[in-house]
């Protein structure tokens, strides 16, 4: 779907022609969340008017909706967007930079932030330079400005720059790998990893539900993912009102699947090892 809806044409290093897929299943997640919004809207309509709704939603719809500034800009000016790597198409500087030792991201969104960046880095080089005086000019002269900044940033370590950015109130972040993220204090403070006991695997770490901090919370951090067919029998009995013999018949002939104690869950490995 990322290929069909143009996402892969704008993702990846700008100097390469190879299409790149976004590394997580974001479209599946967004479609689910959009579906929930549709359901909630339908429930509100039902409560107000007594009328139900048929919700028609597709991955394609959500992919186009999610193209936001890229898609809308094309609709306005008709120009096919190109790959920009980590760069932002309408804001400069807004991208990844390589420090002396490792990478960081810089997001200079406002003119005030750019003024602070100039004062931090090199007023003699950047100040009073009409090519960079406004964001529009910086977008036009992107390559020149990025070249100057990249040269400056390469002379000191990432921690040096991040500390200075913080002092000058300039948005920035280290570019972490997944291990770095799970080692961060905020990950632990926000309880972003749950530990549950799975009936066939044993102790199992899970990504937490982001709604866990809603008060009072309706999400649980103690229930493991269900086994294949774990609730089939319960649903057929309580919601479809099927008798036990019919459920057993459907299970035995393969029409449905009811989980058994010996069900095994395969664990994948997406590491580089």
PLM regions with names:
Residues 1-109, 116:
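Active-site-adjacent "lid/gating" segments in soluble enzymes
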Residues 92-168, 172, 253:
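Aromatic-enriched alpha-helical interface/lid elements that frame and gate functional surfaces
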């Amino acid at each position: 779907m990322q290929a069909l809806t143009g996402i892969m044409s704008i993702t990846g290093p700008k100097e390469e022609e190879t299409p790149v897929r976004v590394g997580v299943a974001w479209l599946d997640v967004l479609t689910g969340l959009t579906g929930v919004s549709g359901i909630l809207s339908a429930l509100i309509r039902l409560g107000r008017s007594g009328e139900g709704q048929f919700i028609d939603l597709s991955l394609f719809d959500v992919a186009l909706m999610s193209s936001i500034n890229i898609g809308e800009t094309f609709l306005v000016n008709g120009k096919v967007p190109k790959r920009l790597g980590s760069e932002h198409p309408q804001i400069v500087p807004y991208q990844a930079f390589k420090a002396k030792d490792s990478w960081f991201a810089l997001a200079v969104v406002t003119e005030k932030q750019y003024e602070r960046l100039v004062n931090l880095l090199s007023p003699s080089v950047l100040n009073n330079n009409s090519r960079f005086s406004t964001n529009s000019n910086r977008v036009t002269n992107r390559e020149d400005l990025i070249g100057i900044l990249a040269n400056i940033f390469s002379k000191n370590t990432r921690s040096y720059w991040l500390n200075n950015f913080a002092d000058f109130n300039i948005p920035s972040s280290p570019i972490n790998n997944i291990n770095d993220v799970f080692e961060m204090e905020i990950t632990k403070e926000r309880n972003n990893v749950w530990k549950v006991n799975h009936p066939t695997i044993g102790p199992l770490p899970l990504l937490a539900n982001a709604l866990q901090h809603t008060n009072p919370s309706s999400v649980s951090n103690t229930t493991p993912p269900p086994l294949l067919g774990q609730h089939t029998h319960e649903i057929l009995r309580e919601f479809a009102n099927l008798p036990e013999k019919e459920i057993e018949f459907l299970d035995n002939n393969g029409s449905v699947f009811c989980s058994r104690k010996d069900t095994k869950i395969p664990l994948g490995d997406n590491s580089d090892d």
